[in-house]
């Protein structure tokens, strides 16, 4: 069966949550038995996000095949549980590079290379490739940036051409825009969104669905006005109100009738739930559609029973997960000591993995972000971590804040504070233990001190220390866990696959010293033998992992390491109360 394509654009302002909406739509379709794949097209000229400043771009999400991609791919995976690849994240820079390389190789036969058709053709080819390589029934493509930005024009033109070829039954446009509320007049204003749609219409793209991003529920008058002036059917004016959690968004959109509407417009009924077609939720069903009894969503007309018919989605487990998130029975505080803590998106997958672990234990995780540069001694660390029930040090690069992290780990080790070190966090644990337990006072990493006499952390074989992209150990690798280790027990198996993004690791020359100590290597790469897991045998819960477990965590399937960390934190809290 020929694939269908959904394109999501954004208007008025950036950072409205197109990626969350795209992931939520993927979940709504997948819950109806429809195979989906999400992808992101960014208009910036960087080759990929790998070398971009975390303060500007947020985290780099690593795919199974080693792609350094936009953080929205993390949203896609957490919502749909469909693994992404490097090809699901495309930048304008990678598009232009491919075209210029092809031109230099004579691929265009001497023709004049232009934005149209060459750039737009390359974009279209990459959009279609997602369907060809995955076999997905629906390809959901998010176009980054904001409509009206000059750099987005080739992408908008490319999707216009795709619609011209495929028609409305195989191609659907969703435009997400802000509908602000002005307290001064007590009204929601539609004019910014109207002008955004006008800009899109000027580029030849007529939205089929408008997602109204708002802080308040939109009124019927707002729906009517947008329907009239944006030339969009009233039932396709969909509220996208701010939720307590991003994981409620799919349920809110389903209550608005969006899932059934998409199935109807793209004629997906025959592929839904084995061909069983059921009527969409009727009037008054919005509350149960979202959370069931005790839910938070209004039932006074926010649902549109005229949205047509579509297969009933199976969102039972998702609703249960959101209920567990909203109604915790316990709480704990997890401290995160890092380099980029002023921007939460820099550690987005870590925070979402902790949230998922909290859901698993019906516990609310209060995340306390601590700037590593503000810790100058072990005493400082003690004050900063006094109320923490667990500590996480996530990944990072560069020397800034390293000594503060070492002090934090020293406090955690001595005070029996549950600790999880991720990537750089494992290296910090190794350095701290070498200095204070193995008595190698000048121990360090060659990344931060090239001339250290005790480089307990060093470059891995085959890696090159360069700031340029493509020089890291990237992607999914197999790790073998030692018999009798705690790591093996909490995973429940001896072989695990985890994603990596690093070039440094435990120096093999010092491995024997650690094996004879309390901080033992218990997980190694199955091919090269590099140490990937260390655990402290004399500590209640102390692990360092060279990989990034946060990338494999899901809101309804917490990663074993985070799940066990939260359990240890809760146990510590109980013991102190």
Swiss-Prot record:
Pfam families: CTP_synth_N (PF06418), GATase (PF00117). Residues 1-268 are annotated as: Amidoligase domain. Mg(2+) binds at residues 72, 142. CTP binds at residues 14, 149-151, 189-194, 225. One of its GO terms (molecular function) is metal ion binding. L-glutamine binds at residues 55, 396, 424-427, 447, 503. ATP binds at residues 15-20, 72. Pathway: Pyrimidine metabolism; CTP biosynthesis via de novo pathway; CTP from UDP: step 2/2. SUPFAM superfamilies: Class I glutamine amidotransferase-like, P-loop containing nucleoside triphosphate hydrolases. CDD domains: CTPS_N, GATase1_CTP_Synthase. The keyword rRNA processing does not apply. It catalyses: UTP + L-glutamine + ATP + H2O = CTP + L-glutamate + ADP + phosphate + 2 H(+); L-glutamine + H2O = L-glutamate + NH4(+); UTP + NH4(+) + ATP = CTP + ADP + phosphate + 2 H(+). One of its GO terms (cellular component) is cytosol. InterPro entries: Class_I_gatase-like, CTP_synthase, CTP_synthase_N, GATASE, GATase1_CTP_Synthase, P-loop_NTPase. GO terms for biological process: 'de novo' CTP biosynthetic process; pyrimidine nucleobase biosynthetic process. Coiled coil: none annotated. UTP binds at residues 14, 189-194, 225. Allosterically activated by GTP, when glutamine is the substrate; GTP has no effect on the reaction when ammonia is the substrate. The allosteric effector GTP functions by stabilizing the protein conformation that binds the tetrahedral intermediate(s) formed during glutamine hydrolysis. Inhibited by the product CTP, via allosteric rather than competitive inhibition. Catalyzes the ATP-dependent amination of UTP to CTP with either L-glutamine or ammonia as the source of nitrogen. Regulates intracellular CTP levels through interactions with the four ribonucleotide triphosphates. This is CTP synthase. It comes from Treponema pallidum subsp. pallidum (strain SS14). The gene is pyrG.
